[in-house]
């Protein structure tokens, strides 16, 4: 099964998240997309928004797009690391994972925990984000 993962703090969730989810579903023929909500992105400043509100807001943005599921895995896998989520999802399922991100995240992807392993275990899909294309194309990850 081909699935997409859009991970993040979703603080706030917005139409851009929905747009890249729809585009990824169409372009890569994904059966479902998981919005994996985290309490805190380790590379961003602290969020004061409760996880329950983030999940509620994500569901509001998603609306009737039933191919998108909002999940909070940190209480299950005891981690907010992307590699731990990927390992958890692949453990009992035959998933082909497409990890979706905006160009702003590509800039610092080399700083993510086990970023090389992430890119070996799933397909990384980067979407342009206004104002970030130039810097993302200069990033250490892009140059590799």
Label the predicted regions.
Residues 1-144:
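Nucleotidyltransferase catalytic core that binds NTPs
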